[in-house]
Amino acid sequence: MVDTSLSVVELFIGFEYNKIDKSVFVEEKIVNELRKEIAIQQKKGLPFIMTSVIIWLLILLVSILDINMNMKNLLVFCCSCPLLPLSWIIGKLIKVDIFSKENPLGQLGFIFTLNQMIYLLIVMWVFSAVPEKMIMVYAMVFGAHLFPYSWLYKSKGYTVVAISIPVISLILGCTLNGTTVAAAACIIEVVFACVLHMELKKMADN
């Protein structure tokens, strides 16, 4: 009788675990479908990446100006102001609604973007403490904030760029200057935009 009771308990526990496993599998499948949908809908954030090319080009131009360092750094901050309007315009041109709320994960992407705003406090500190290194730190923060998008958009490109920009910026910023960092960031973003285009093409083919 005892043995039978144990068997029933074991069967019940096994059944419950099976239900949990199936539930987790279903939820994971739904999330993966949502990730695929948002990657296609938002074209893996291509409007923002294309805008970042323009922004880093502006920062590059500012960095070569023969003006006071504090004024130069202030202008570098101002270069980021057109991010949303430019991304919206580019989004319209390539048929992407950057403010779309159709996909629940869209809000998560917005939170990832806001995350960068917190790290900008570090850049503000560098602005006053080590002004000549501000572009370097700014580039490092910019690159690092891209990392969560590698999960959201299922993109290896985001992973590589999120790691390479901070590392390259640190090396160039410590050995050379902010102008070199801005030029490198601009070039990387151009290449990255091309990589995302190829990833999207591959996703469409599949």
Regions found by a protein language model. Name each.
Residues 120-166:
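Membrane-proximal helix-loop-helix units in multi-pass membrane proteins
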Residues 158-206:
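Terminal transmembrane helical module of multi-pass membrane proteins
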Residues 52-56, 112-122, 162-166:
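Core segments of transmembrane alpha-helices
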Residues 36-50:
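N-terminal membrane topogenic signal
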Residues 80-87, 140-149, 187-197:
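Alpha-helical transmembrane segments and their membrane-interface exit regions
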Residues 52-107:
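Selected alpha-helical membrane-embedding segments in polytopic membrane proteins
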Residues 96-128:
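Helix-adjacent hinge/juxtasegments
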Residues 16, 20-39:
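Short, Lys/Arg-rich, polar N-terminal cytosolic tail immediately upstream
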